[in-house]
């Protein structure tokens, strides 16, 4: 993903906040969306206790991203849609990069999606993976090139 110190990063799937904390050490600001309220609340407490003031967590459906803080330099997704959600593509800054697992429950690929300066998306399959499914994916999505 090549994170930079001034990057604005969207994380989908906060979990307990470990990856959020790691990201917060190397980028400027992290916005993280977690669909499970209990996990989000635990992450908020842990991140606050550890002094991570540059991470904001909210409860919500990651499919929709966090448009109020877009565009993002980087997007990292930790649950797999069958195809890349258009809201996440739309919230990726020109020149930005997204890492996302994509596919069916038994056939997923970790994908690097890059948006060029003209807004075109190029994707590259990195490796086979197995993630939990991204909830709320019931809308048309972007097909990989």
State where each predicted segment sits.
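Conserved nucleotide-cofactor-binding alpha/beta core module
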Residues: 2-118
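Active-site capping/gating segments
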Residues: 103-145
């Amino acid at each position: 993903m090549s994170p930079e110190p001034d990057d604005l990063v969207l994380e989908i799937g906060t979990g307990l906040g470990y990856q959020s904390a790691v990201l917060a050490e190397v980028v400027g600001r992290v916005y993280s969306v977690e669909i499970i309220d209990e996990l989000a609340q635990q992450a908020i407490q842990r991140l606050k206790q550890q002094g991570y003031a540059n991470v904001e967590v909210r409860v919500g459906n990651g499919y929709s991203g966090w448009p109020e803080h877009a565009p993002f330099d980087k997007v990292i997704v930790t649950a797999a849609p069958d195809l890349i959600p258009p809201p996440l593509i739309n919230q990726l800054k020109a020149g930005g990069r997204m890492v996302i697992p994509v596919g069916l429950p038994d056939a997923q690929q970790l994908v690097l999606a890059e948006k060029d300066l003209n807004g075109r998306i190029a994707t590259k399959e990195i490796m086979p993976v197995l993630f939990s499914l991204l909830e709320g994916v019931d809308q048309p999505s972007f097909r990989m090139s």
